[in-house]
């Protein structure tokens, strides 16, 4: 029906225009030096290889990328990070964490440490919370799952 398709279009627009709040958990190969932090980089997407990379601000086509993280659990070799995206770039979390020296466990594309040993894990990255304004009532709505990663 027309009403529900309009609502769906509004939700889609919020996600595409970065108006929706998106949160993730990731298990990293390595532990960040700081328990809380912000990663700010410039990313360039390569459509031919379906990858992105960190580049200098002056690189043609580079786009600003920013995320905030907090360590929620860790052991000697891994950490569980709670991540909030301020921007939503192609493979942003994967690229920025790898560039920071703490790639995601199971990331065959950006975790070059793991490429040598292949853990057999899938990509340990999970969207756990999304928030947006209800298209009709404009009330803030949030949907969340529990942290799926235990270390």
Q: What is each residue range found by the language model?
A:
Residues 1-151:
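RNA pseudouridine synthases
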């Amino acid at each position: 029906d027309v009403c529900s398709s309009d609502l769906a279009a509004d939700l889609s627009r919020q996600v595409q225009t970065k108006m929706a709040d998106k949160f993730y958990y990731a298990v990293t190969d390595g532990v960040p030096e700081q328990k809380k932090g912000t990663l700010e980089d410039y990313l360039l997407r390569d459509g031919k290889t379906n990858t992105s990379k960190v580049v200098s601000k002056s690189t043609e086509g580079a786009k600003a990328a920013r995320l905030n993280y907090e360590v929620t659990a860790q052991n000697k070799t891994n950490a569980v990070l709670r991540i909030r995206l301020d921007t939503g770039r192609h493979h942003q979390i994967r690229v920025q964490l790898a560039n920071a020296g703490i790639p995601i466990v199971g990331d065959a594309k950006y975790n070059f440490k793991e490429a040598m040993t292949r853990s057999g894990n899938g990509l340990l990255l999970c969207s756990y919370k999304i928030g947006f304004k209800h298209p009709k009532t404009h009330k803030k709505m949030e949907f969340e799952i529990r942290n799926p990663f235990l270390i």
